[in-house]
Amino acid sequence: MLQIDVVILAAGMGKRMRSTLPKVLHPLAGKPILFHVLDTARILSPTKICVIYGHGGELVRQTVGNDPNLIWVKQTQQLGTGHAVKQALPCLGKNGITLVLFGDVPLVKSNTLKSLIDKACEDSLALLTVELNDPAGYGRIIRDPKTNRVQAIVEEQDALPSQKKIREINTGIMVLPNMYLESWLDRLSNANTQGEYYLTDIIAMAVNDGVQIETSSPASDWEVVGVNDKIQLSTLERAHQQDVAKGLMEQGVMFADPARFDVRGQLICGHNVEIDINCVFEGNVRLGDNVKISANCILRNVAISDGSIVHPFSMIEDTEVGKNCRVGPYARIRPGTQLDDAVHVGNFVEIKNSHIASGSKVNHLSYIGDTEMGRRVNIGAGTITCNYDGAFKHQTIIEDDVFIGSDSQLIAPITVAKGSTIGAGSTITRDTPEGQLTLSRIKQISIANWKRPKKNKD
């Protein structure tokens, strides 16, 4: 099996980003640009992944974390792409091939890279190229007019006027045979307008050495677009999100507007899922059959089962939602919550770290925290489970078939027994008996001849 090494060039300063954050750490679809490149590289199961870092390098390494499968090589001076790859030479195998990727080209797909790798072997070279209507700024692919074979790559700054008319450009992504790589890199020169060591100069060397050069192209141009400023980053963000939306629509998802939708992780959908505008999905989100997500909702690490509806302006995170539930509008479901089947959570309700059993309803203006709630419970408007004493959290247990009247407070730790009714306006501090009405109110009185205070007119 052919050994594949990967070199990722991530040492650039990114001046045009106008940011103290290294360019490769700017987020796209919820994760740093470099993470996209690393994730794609890992899909290829390479022998080694070598990251060339420079500007802000320690922060880059810290953000990526301790991955024993990554080799980090520092490029102290940014002297060009050829110089950058040369820094990785001690880490690369003597045989096999090396795939060169760029830390600021985040959206190239693994299938595109697999096709490129298939074109290469231990004694040939493969380039990823693309034809652009406006190729300005890119190196041009120079081909033999008779054989159509690649002869060289000429950078924009060094190209002749006739060469600048060529629309086929070099993306920078290439597969190189390791057996030639050291010799080629040693022969690079910086005698050009930029004074840099261009990796692309090895193409002419390969031609002179009789090495066959193959080319491959991506399915979409935006796969090979790099990020140099915030405008390009924004453009790639939308291209990525529309590509994700297209894939979901091909699976049957219905969008109110696929242009107003963001996935910052992974979204898996069942049949007949409907997603309204301005919804954001973060982490791992799974939606079952016939689920409807209304406008302006945020879902983070959520599993929602068949037939459930999330109404507008709701936020759900780290939660499991059962079948045929109703959540919102304006509901907040916080981490550690499980809603069983047919649970209703209404407007301006917050639930945290709680289990709500099937058929229960919390419809209005309530806070339920650290609670184990049984089946068929009805929580009146303005109910608060008082779970925090200033130092520790305590649990509230509400058993099956309980009715809690409006504007009630349950002071945890407490158990409201099966079938209990809590009268409206009560503050409950002790466990309640099963099947009884429990109240805690002062006696209502009316004061005759009482006059409301009035302001002086002085």
From Swiss-Prot:
Record-linked CDD domains: GT2_GlmU_N_bac, LbH_GlmU_C
Co-factor binding details: Binds 1 Mg(2+) ion per subunit.
EC number: 2.7.7.23, 2.3.1.157
Annotated pathway: Nucleotide-sugar biosynthesis; UDP-N-acetyl-alpha-D-glucosamine biosynthesis; N-acetyl-alpha-D-glucosamine 1-phosphate from alpha-D-glucosamine 6-phosphate (route II): step 2/2; Nucleotide-sugar biosynthesis; UDP-N-acetyl-alpha-D-glucosamine biosynthesis; UDP-N-acetyl-alpha-D-glucosamine from N-acetyl-alpha-D-glucosamine 1-phosphate: step 1/1; Bacterial outer membrane biogenesis; LPS lipid A biosynthesis
Active site (UniProt): 364 (proton acceptor)
This protein's UniProt keywords: Acyltransferase, Cell shape, Cell wall biogenesis/degradation, Cytoplasm, Magnesium, Metal-binding, Multifunctional enzyme, Nucleotidyltransferase, Peptidoglycan synthesis, Repeat, Transferase
Domain of life: Bacteria
Residues binding UDP-N-acetyl-alpha-D-glucosamine: 9-12, 23, 75, 80-81, 139, 155, 170, 228, 334, 352, 367, 378
Binding of Mg(2+), residues: 104, 228
Residues binding acetyl-CoA: 381, 387-388, 406, 424, 441
Name assigned to this protein: Bifunctional protein GlmU
Protein source organism: Nitrosomonas eutropha (strain DSM 101675 / C91 / Nm57)
